[in-house]
Amino acid sequence: MLAEAKRIRDRFDAELRAIYVGEQTEETSQTFREAFAQLQLPIDSTIYYEGGGEPAEAILRALAREKIGLVVAGALEKEVVLHQFLGNVARRLVREAVCSVILFTKPQVKPKALRCIVFIADYSEHGLQALKTTLPFAEAESCERLYVIRIITAFDEARASIGSNAADPRDNKTNDDEEDALEKFVLSAGATEVPIETRCIRGNTGLAASDFVRSVTADLLVVPMRKNIRSLPSNIAWVTDVIPCNLWVIR
């Protein structure tokens, strides 16, 4: 996990700090020094020892107290055929952390490049800034394909079907309108060398997006999420339970 965190540190030219849920002992201090040295990290890197209590609470407390901008953690509690389920700590980080979160499903000592990335678009200002943050990261990862997708559920389409009675005509969009809006959203993020493909994903529920992520064998799913909002929109709420690949929640 520390190797994956170092990769993220390098991508953002940031300072790496560690959170350890437990008491500081000479043994744990030595273990960290050895791990830091192996990864060519400063051996005096900051470690927050959060002794006692429930792990998720301890981590959330440290993130808020130290004003951390991004936390990198492991994702999985269990895995069954075709589905990977978030562990309790990871789930609470996604819902409650005051900062951005990156979760790795299978962290590796020698991290592999994230060649295929899926970004879930929303047309808010935060969503646009999140895409602008994703583009240089994807370029640094030598991303071969960045899918920017818009999730359209049966509920969304039912709401649009009564658009003629809606106060806002933008609620009544045709398929072409949706595709055009998504293209304009991507173009507004600026130029990039990363190959981008836009897709409108339709399904009865937002889980259709999870199916799409698996179908393209994505390495990373990126989800914009505004700060101080614990409840994800219904069409992407599934990411707090089933995680199809590594996950980056941008706050």
Region spans (language model):
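Amphipathic coiled-coil/heptad-repeat helices and related helical stalk/stem segments
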Residues: 1, 55-56, 86, 130, ...
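Small/aliphatic-rich secondary-structure junction motif
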Residues: 1-45, 116-168, 188-191, 195, ...
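Structural beta-alpha unit
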Residues: 7, 23-27, 31-71, 187-221, ...
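Surface-exposed, flexible loop/turn segments at secondary-structure boundaries
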Residues: 24-26, 79, 109, 125, ...
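Gly/Ser-rich helix-loop-strand patches that form or flank binding pockets
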Residues: 59-110, 211-251
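Conserved residues at the C-terminal ends of beta-strands
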Residues: 74, 120, 149, 202, ...
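A short acidic, glycine-rich active-site loop
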Residues: 167-177
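Well-ordered, non-membrane alpha-helical segments in soluble/globular domains
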Residues: 178-183
